[in-house]
């Protein structure tokens, strides 16, 4: 199982430089070929950044229909634990929360373009490594 960071979705949805690679990677998750998890925090972050009802609905439908993707709903206690990790692992809150979830699910890697994850004990991978 992999944890997919918010920036992978945004790269595609905002039509950024690596959009095509992210699309192919996310298609493998959608088909169930790759198993992955995201947090409800990721869902809300994408919604807030898109700020367009049509794009948000399309994103949510894709998440809902993705065979290989689970959305993990964090509990308040877990968010508190992630906030206490921030200083120790030198990550901001959203990255610390993703790290916390990655540890909880014992993921193989965090798929992200965020190099801050290179400092933790879980491997960071990029989408092209799964194509």
Locations of regions flagged by a protein language model:
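Acidic, PIN/NYN-like endoribonuclease modules and their adjacent C-terminal/linker elements
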Residues: 1, 100, 104-131
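Active-site neighborhoods of divalent-metal-dependent phosphate/nucleic-acid chemistry enzymes
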Residues: 70-113
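Structured helix-beta-strand junction loops
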Residues: 32-33, 66-67, 88, 120
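Active-site-proximal, substrate-binding regions of enzyme catalytic domains
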Residues: 41-43, 47-70
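Short, well-structured N-terminal submotif of metal-dependent ribonuclease cores
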Residues: 1-37, 49-58, 129-131
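A generic structural signal for short hydrophobic patches within well-formed alpha-helices
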Residues: 9, 43, 117-118
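Conserved beta-strand segments of alpha/beta enzyme cores
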Residues: 35, 68-70, 109, 123
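Conserved glycosyltransferase catalytic-site signature
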Residues: 6, 40, 95-99
């Amino acid at each position: 199982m992999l944890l997919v960071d918010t920036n992978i979705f945004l790269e595609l949805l905002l039509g950024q430089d690596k959009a095509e690679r992210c699309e192919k990677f996310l298609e493998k998750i959608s088909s169930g070929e790759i198993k992955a998890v995201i947090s409800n925090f990721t869902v809300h972050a994408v919604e807030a950044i898109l700020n367009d009802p049509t794009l948000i609905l399309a994103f949510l439908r894709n998440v809902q229909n993705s065979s290989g993707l689970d959305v993990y709903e964090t509990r308040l206690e877990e968010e508190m634990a992630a906030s206490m990790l921030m200083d120790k692992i030198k990550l901001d809150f959203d990255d610390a929360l993703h790290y916390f979830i990655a540890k909880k699910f014992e993921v193989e890697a965090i798929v992200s373009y965020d190099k801050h994850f290179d400092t933790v004990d879980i491997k960071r991978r990029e989408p092209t490594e799964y194509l």
